[in-house]
């Protein structure tokens, strides 16, 4: 019996460490608050994603205006996120999170009361409303910088993985609750759909307030300039020789270089070498095609399409997208093992291509069941290419250029994605909503095939000195790639895990 208890204890200890829970626990209260903050926020984002297009339709907005709203909101979130991220370290990260949470609550309050298109658009662009369910505002980049700042290299990947996984589960909960909430509210006396949709934004007010509270109680350790350098400087000034000051200055510069301050936008492109550009031009072209397709068939628009075509109950609609979100979360766990066995490009193509085909055929079924199966295939496999893509970019780009390349990649993808909803809105208004899925599926398939033909034979790690020889066909990845795979798990979404 004692032996069995000892064996169970060892297994529990192994699971505790291997699951990353030990890393999250050791990271401390600030990390817990950051993880909880994003989980609550994604709960609200996904709850609104499920209903916002239907809400606008009930208000009498044209389909074109619905698409235009989503495009402008996405652009507004990106601009706000870029500006605030560049200023965050100077203003104070916690202050920025407090301001973001406040704007989120204010936006929720406006949406819960007003029905004018331009007032709602202003609230969505200036405030923090995610029409696509994506975390494109100022929060995520700052929170990831804070998590990286308060964790060690040994625990960082596990903490970031739980940060993403927890938020995905929160998003699934938001989708499930939103459908039930709307349906239950409409059964109450004096409540109609418009009033119920207004009420869903109460969750925005609540989660915004919680984000403010969490940011208030975080410690000064999360700030970019928090270290013990001032105390050390006092001690040195009292007793150490002047020549040691140069060493202190070098150490201070190294610490500053390790913080997550974003590079200046003007210097990003010029810092990328011509060799890297020759590779990235092709990849950027393909990623732009893929992002345009994603924008045309975003989750909000897909929900709107299902609601108009089949008119399922709001609870059913919520359960469908909640289950799809859980599938997407679970599938990302297998991205790393698949990449080690198939290679990065093969994993990206062989998982994303079935998802693209399901988008192409999505408008064809006349029954809800087959349509939902296609949706599950699409969302279940959709996110598995994100982590391998990040690892592939890291493998073909010089280490000192990765930050610039990642920044340019994110900007191009977002701009392309923002164009999509307006195109779909125009098609939907003319009674050709289904064409958006046809075009989106074709564009995604073009991306997949182009990716395979252009890059499957490319040698990886040619810029890294610790590899004795380059690796062809992406058939193996090293420990650095594995860590990046783990850190990249919704995304993109993420920033893509949620938006497709």
Where are these regions (language model features)?
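Residue-level signature of mid-helix packing/kink "hotspots" within the transmembrane helices
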Residues: 74-82, 171-172, 325-333, 414-418
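Symmetry-related core transmembrane helices of the 12-TM Major Facilitator Superfamily/SLC fold
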Residues: 195-216, 435-453
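Glycine-rich segments within core transmembrane alpha-helices of 12-TM secondary carriers
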Residues: 157-183, 412-420
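Helix-loop boundary and gating motifs at the non-cytosolic
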Residues: 16-79, 279-287, 291-322
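Structural signature of the two symmetry-related core transmembrane helices
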Residues: 95-110, 346-361
